[in-house]
């Protein structure tokens, strides 16, 4: 009787461990898959929207211009973060200097968000009308996933 009970307990423990490992593995797989998909919206859009050669050329020019604009704003954002760090290092309390540096960070971050949205709509305008619904679906789905 003791042998049977020990065996059932061992099998239950093994089953529980395997179930736990399976759940953890599935969670890791799906969370990383979604992060990768969410992180590269640009690639998803290109896969979802069937571009012709003319559209590709137009969009490539728009993408190059946006990449330059993004680099400029990101440089400002890094500089603003540096000023904020300096202000906090000088006086580790809320101060007029920290407030001013915080506002500079917020302006740069807001500029980056606006530039990104302008770029999204410029890209859409470069598509043929029949390709815009697919673009819109991917964009809206990505925004909704990001808000959850």
UniProtKB/Swiss-Prot annotation:
Keywords: Cobalt, Coiled coil, Nickel, Periplasm, Plasmid, Signal. Induction: By nickel and cobalt. Residues 54-117 form a coiled coil. It holds the Pfam family Metal_resist. The keyword Coiled coil applies. InterPro entries: Metal_resist. CnrH alone is able to activate cnr expression, while both CnrY and CrnR (CnrX) are needed for nickel induction of CnrH. Has been suggested to bind nickel. To A.xylosoxydans NccX. This is Nickel and cobalt resistance protein CnrR. It comes from Cupriavidus metallidurans (strain ATCC 43123 / DSM 2839 / NBRC 102507 / CH34) (Ralstonia metallidurans).
């Amino acid at each position: 009787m003791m042998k049977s009970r020990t065996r059932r307990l061992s099998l239950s423990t093994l089953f529980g461990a395997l179930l736990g490992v399976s759940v953890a593995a599935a969670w890791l797989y799906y969370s990383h898959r979604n992060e990768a998909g969410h992180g590269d919206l640009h690639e998803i859009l290109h896969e979802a929207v069937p571009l012709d050669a003319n559209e590709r050329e137009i969009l490539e020019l728009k993408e190059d211009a946006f990449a330059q604009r993004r680099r400029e704003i990101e440089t400002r954002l890094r500089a603003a973060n540096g000023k904020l760090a300096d202000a906090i290092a000088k006086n580790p309390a809320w101060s007029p200097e920290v407030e001013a540096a915080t506002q500079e960070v917020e302006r740069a971050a807001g500029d980056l968000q606006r530039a990104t949205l302008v770029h999204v709509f410029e890209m859409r305008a470069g598509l043929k009308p029949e390709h815009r619904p697919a673009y819109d679906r991917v964009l809206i789905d990505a925004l909704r996933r990001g808000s959850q």
